Amino acid sequence: MLVKNLVRQEKHVISVDIGDSVYTACHRMTENHVSMLVVVNAMQVMGLFSEHDLATKVLDCNLDPRKTMVCKVMSPIVAAASPNDTIDHALGLLERHRLHHLPVVDNGRVIDILSIRQIYSLVNQALATDLNHMRAYIGGDYSAPLPQ
């Protein structure tokens, strides 16, 4: 399966301006029910800001979220997937770089953010489907279509 099969077409990526405060970024994450934002400067992607950045770079360091700018605590994009990458490749990037989120970039534009939870859920569903097919086959239901 390819990454483009997981990309949500109707979803727009939630972003925060590089000059915004951490407080503003956290408010944006809360109101949009996301745990990561793309940090932009004049529509150019500069990095990512996540709950992990908040915990380790702001709260653990006793910084004031209202006075701390996102640009001071954001993380660089160390890896990205393209829509035509396989899910296995995307999972490998997440594991190799010890990430929880992976930007999906198409033509230089972040079109979605995949979470490791989404990928593991997909893998779990595929394994469950395969297991059901195998059980049906072993149980004598030879008419059950085998997975492709």
Positions of the model-derived regions?
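Tandem CBS (Bateman) regulatory domains
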Residues: 1-12, 50-80, 86-95, 116-148
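The conserved cystathionine-beta-synthase
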Residues: 15-33, 40, 80-98, 105
